[in-house]
Amino acid sequence: MRKILLTAAFAALTLASSVSANWITGEPTILAVNSGEAAFHTALTSDQRLDVNLTAGEEGKADLTFTTKASESALSLTALPVLVSEEAGFADAKLTITPLVNDANGLRFYLVDTGEAGGAHIVSYKGAAFKSAFSAAELQDVTGTSYFTVEKKQLLLHVNENGTEDIYTLSLDTKSLTFTAVK
């Protein structure tokens, strides 16, 4: 009897641990402009497209439009702040789009990293439609530079302001396809 109970307990633990989700990233798309404005068109997949207008000057700005062949709906993110770095008299702005998949449910997301906390976004993709799943601009008192890190079991948003780093853990609500941030 004891052997049966131990076997059942071990099986329950094994099954419970096998359903936890892992985050898997794809190859990032990095777009940059040097002192001026540029438009980019890139394929995210065979049926998904991303159009970007990126500006670097005193301030950096980006307009992004996510579209699909299968749907007329599009998601536009406008006037996102982009970090501008000055080197040798040139103003450079960089934008990184990283595909992200949750292997437990197959849900697909795109991390939008502008280098500025107010421009950090996560876009979800499901059923041939894009949706804004997270915007760091909606967090209270979040300014400064930022970047995402993807660990096996969690997503983190790092925000740096005046030499102080705050780290937010991003949790996915699979029903609404949105993320909440906890400091």
Briefly describe each language-model feature range.
Residues 6-11:
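Sec-dependent N-terminal signal peptides
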Residues 49, 105-110, 152-156:
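Entry beta-strands of beta-propeller and related beta-repeat scaffolds
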Residues 73-90:
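Surface-exposed loop and turn segments in beta-propeller and other repeat-based domains
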Residues 96-135:
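Long, charged/polar, surface-exposed segments that mediate recognition or autoinhibition
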Residues 1-4:
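Positively charged n-region of N-terminal signal peptides that target proteins for export
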Residues 21-39, 44, 54-59, 125-183:
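Acidic, small-residue rich beta-repeat scaffolds with periodic aromatic anchors
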Residues 63-74:
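Beta-propeller domains
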Residues 16-18:
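N-terminal signal peptide c-region/cleavage motif recognized by signal peptidases
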